[in-house]
Amino acid sequence: DGLYIMKNVDVYITGSNAYLLSGELATLLTGRYIEIKMYPLSFKEYLNYYKKDADEKMYLNYINRSSFPYALKLEEESEIDDYLDALYNTIIVKDIGLRKKIADTTMLRTVARFMFNNIGNCLSIKKIADTLTSDGRSISVHTVESYLESLVESYVFNKVSRFDIKGKQYLQSGEKYYATDVTMRYALLGRRNIDVGHI
């Protein structure tokens, strides 16, 4: 209450944990806050940090070393991989698991792996469920939808809907998902040859 009665005071709340992402905090602060979404560094910001011009080497560094600001301080690939593993465990396993009350996060991990392996492809929720089920991992369309919503809400992926120019409306299926930071895929898929055309 002390801050409430003081004039000229700004309070900043930062974070990305399950409580902040759940919307409960936003409900408590309704009408009294401005949300500023912070993303990992864009390629331009990455170049500005290193004071370099865009070239193939810098782009490959960007997609291999991570665009999270903390990763810029890390020297060794193993340190970056440890950091990405920690991010994965914090964001996907703990935050999403807690927020959605997922006791067994194995299937969430499977969906995340599928998404990181299909960055930029046109996907439907049914196609994802069918593909995972055909691989011996039975999962419902509803569960896939819930997990995808959680991954998007947690800023792991950005969803891009298809737009019908003639009909001037968004199509209901065939969305594309792009990773907010493509290096997070290394925590799930390991460091193997990546198709840079899809990221």
PLM feature segments, named:
Residues T14, M38, V160-R162:
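Conserved beta-strand termini and adjacent loop/short-helix elements that scaffold enzyme active sites
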Residues D1-I13, N17-A18, A26-L28:
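Conserved catalytic/switch belt of AAA+ P-loop NTPases
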Residues M6, T30-Y33, Q172:
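Short connector loops at helix/strand junctions that flank enzyme active sites
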Residues S16-A18, S22-C122:
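Interdomain motor-coupling "hinge/lid" segment immediately C-terminal to the ATP-binding subdomain
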Residues E77, D81-I199:
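Accessory nucleic acid-recognition modules appended to NTPase machines
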Residues Y12, I34-I36, Y178:
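Hydrophobic/aromatic beta-strand patches that form the interior of the parallel beta-sheet core
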